[in-house]
Amino acid sequence: MIELQGRKIALIGGAGFIGHNLALTLAEMGAEVHAVDSLQVNNLGAFSNSHEDANKALYLHFIHDRLRLLQEAQIPLHVVDARDYHVLSRCLNDMKPDTIVQLAAIAHANRANKDPYSTFDHSLRTLENALDCARGLKARFIYFSSSMVYGNFDGEAVTEERHCEPLGIY
């Protein structure tokens, strides 16, 4: 198993579904984890300010629960918009992580395809900024993607050797 004791890890998109679960697991394994999230996409800001949605109360409950779990685990949450290079760079330079994990993205294929500009802005812009910050800090970089990049595939699993055939911008 990888030794994480004493490693400082920044999770960009760390308050999302995968991000908060990863943060909790890494912290349990001894890493010093920092969640970096704007709380704008697939998150508190998006749902609390949205129009009436039948699932709004449920989504808000999930989001509040994520934030509570991060707080209880004493994982710092840096509310930072990773689309702004200067703000993200300042945050990460102050933090000095050993590893940066990029999780920030529009997490719903239908929403992503309906608003490609926002998807590009929240997914690729944050990726570009995170990569540049990692290079400057000489930090390891891990990028989380989605099985959606492989398109429709047969079977239960797909390997990284499979050719990418994305069906949309997501």
Task: Give, region by region, the residue ranges found by the protein language model.
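N-terminal Rossmann-like NAD(P)+-binding domain of SDR-like oxidoreductases, especially those catalyzing
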Residues: 1-170
